[in-house]
């Protein structure tokens, strides 16, 4: 059985009079893809900040192995599109030259050889997101946190991105924690789905999202229309 690498136990966080998350409990298991979904203002960013150690819980307990190396890909990667820098230069700035064979294979998968001489500003959204993801792997993290990685990507780019995530998990034995608002892509590609709206509404495997299940009803109440999923299966 896969062991948890992060555990939240009855965690609440207050900012002044605001309580973005209240009594939240969940675990992230090693080598799983766990996706956190929820509407805007649900507390997803607060969860990430707590996981990264940027905030401390007001109450409750968070258990994270202090040796755990965490990589983070923010929703908006602050890199000026006017920057006259090539993909290769960008990655060289972030990485030592002694890349492992596994990371070289991932670079091959994102077609780095073809892209390396392109300016960052000329990349498509999907290409740029894959380059940012590759750069986050250079520190060889145990866990990678992806904040809305699929936003503004077309369907083809989303599929390619998930293929890359699957390869990364397999080759590098990395655990993936992803924030998303796209339920249908999540259903196909996650081991665990956590639905958050200030508190945990439901959690389980994508298989638990069946017609009229508690999971499905909770998602529907937050505006996630699960009948599309029923249609496909």
Swiss-Prot record:
Membrane topology: Peripheral membrane protein
ABC transporter domain sequence ranges: 6-222
Example of a GO biological process term: response to zinc ion
Reactions catalysed: Zn(2+)(out) + ATP(in) + H2O(in) = Zn(2+)(in) + ADP(in) + phosphate(in) + H(+)(in)
Residues spanning the signal sequence: none
Domain of life of the organism encoding this protein: Bacteria
Top-level enzyme category: translocase
UniProt EC number: 7.2.2.20
Residue sites binding ATP per the record: 38-45
UniProt subcellular location: Cell inner membrane
PROSITE patterns for this protein: ABC_TRANSPORTER_1, ABC_TRANSPORTER_2, ZNUC
InterPro entries the record matches: AAA+_ATPase, ABC_transporter-like_ATP-bd, ABC_transporter-like_CS, Metal_Ion_Import_ABC, P-loop_NTPase
Family indicated by similarity: Belongs to the ABC transporter superfamily. Zinc importer (TC 3.A.1.15.5) family.
Subunit structure: The complex is composed of two ATP-binding proteins (ZnuC), two transmembrane proteins (ZnuB) and a solute-binding protein (ZnuA).
Its job: Part of the ABC transporter complex ZnuABC involved in zinc import. Responsible for energy coupling to the transport system.
Name of this chain's protein: Zinc import ATP-binding protein ZnuC
Gene: znuC
